[in-house]
Amino acid sequence: MRLKFQFVNKQAWIISMPAYLFLALISFLLHSCAAVSNGDIPESRQNRIISNIPFYAQEDYQCGPASLAGVMNYWKIDVTPDDIAKEIYSKSAKGTLNIDMVIYPQRKGLIAEQYSGNMQDLKKNIDSGYPLIVFVDYGFWAVQSNHFMVVVGYNEDGVIVNSGKDKGKFISEEDFIKTWEKTKFWTLLIKRK
């Protein structure tokens, strides 16, 4: 069996069933909340870090609730990832919707602003004591592998994040921007009123 995909420019590509199944398998394996990091923070760099942000290791598909719990507890709102997931986790999406990431902290009395960020803004917020939740995409081609993480610091070479099961992991600026730009630099700033 062959599947035929037609594109707007009238070109047609033929993908054999084995190739289609391979793409489907890759899509399945690259699920929401995939976490990738570059490793430890380089020792020789001057790091700017907000050190007292609570860390919650994420469970499967729970990067949104884990990220929100860390930032909200930083602002002294006592919630757990499980509390948050009960209210905003979507089983059908196997994750958390972006809009729910904004609405949930607002319902708990915090200011939550979602916008398209940049590195300068990210650094300014970290310097001011505001951790940011960012939405990145580790996927390739048409396959998305979305993930929320908390930016807790930076240095001249990259960012320091709480992501997945990793607290304070370093990601080079180049790698970070490649994944962040795929989401149009989705950024969530949460702060007290």
Segments and roles (model prediction):
Residues 70-78, 87-91, 104-111, 125-129, ...:
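Structured segments of extracytoplasmic/periplasmic soluble domains
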Residues 16, 30-94, 98, 119, ...:
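Active-site-adjacent structural segments surrounding the nucleophilic cysteine of cysteine proteases
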Residues 111, 115-164, 169-170, 192:
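Active-site-adjacent substructure of cysteine-protease-like catalytic cores
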Residues 2-31:
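Sec-dependent bacterial lipoprotein signal peptides
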Residues 101:
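Compact soluble domain cores
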Residues 34-39, 94, 152-193:
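Noncatalytic regulatory segments and standalone regulatory/sensor domains
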